[in-house]
């Protein structure tokens, strides 16, 4: 379960539409590093992410990506297997949108609380 509490320069950001959850694999880790400049945590303008080029951009891993609606700054993923994941959250404060990314780990079916 998670919530958006991101602010920059005194402006609070709200989530836009859905939150993506991508499994951490060697391919997705390299892709995330290229797109966001980190595999741990990032806040990058959406236009910058879209402008970056990734190797093998046509690789089809979409069947493994999960998506949930973000409502009132909150989101939740249930039934995740143990492992590493990348949360991808588009946010806006009325200006140019940003994309937040954070790495999370799930273990033993326990809930993980994440604040971005």
Feature locations, PLM:
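Long luminal/extracellular ectodomains of secretory-pathway precursor proteins
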Residues: 1-116
């Amino acid at each position: 379960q998670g919530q958006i509490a991101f602010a920059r320069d005194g402006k609070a950001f709200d989530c836009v539409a859905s939150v993506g959850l991508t499994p951490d694999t060697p391919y997705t880790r390299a892709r995330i590093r290229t797109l966001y400049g980190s595999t741990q945590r990032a806040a990058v303008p959406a236009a910058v992410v879209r402008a970056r080029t990734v190797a093998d951009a046509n690789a089809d891993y979409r069947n493994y990506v999960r998506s949930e609606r973000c409502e009132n700054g909150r989101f939740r993923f249930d039934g995740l297997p143990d492992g590493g994941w990348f949360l991808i959250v588009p946010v806006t404060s009325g200006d140019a949108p940003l994309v937040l990314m954070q790495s999370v780990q799930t273990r033993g079916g326990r809930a993980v609380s994440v604040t971005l």
